[in-house]
Amino acid sequence: MEQAIGKAVMVVFMEPVEGTELEFNDWYNRHHVPERVSVPGILNGRRYELSDGDEAPKYLAIYELENESVLHSDAYLQNVKDSTPMNFPRPKVQRLVYRQVFPESGTFDDKTGFPPSKPT
């Protein structure tokens, strides 16, 4: 089954305040990611923990987007407004959005992101 590739990604780097990591991870996994991926146009979300290196934030989240406009949609803005609140000090966060430049389109059917070859 083919799965479309989004035209943009939002990456979020996070460093929880010392002593709040368990609460942070519970909130992020149980509330934040499911809330965000419920927004039309956010195709999926994944989280990562730093496994090598010490000059970067400990956590990374990547959200695949149909396109950048998703982050300006009424649905997204309402989702942010209605988000489950954090009951712990806010982590240090850096949020960046990247637009896909190559390939211009494609699917995941062959795991390359390139459009499938047409039979000759």
Language-model features, listed with the residues they occupy:
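Macromolecular interaction modules
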Residues: M1-T120
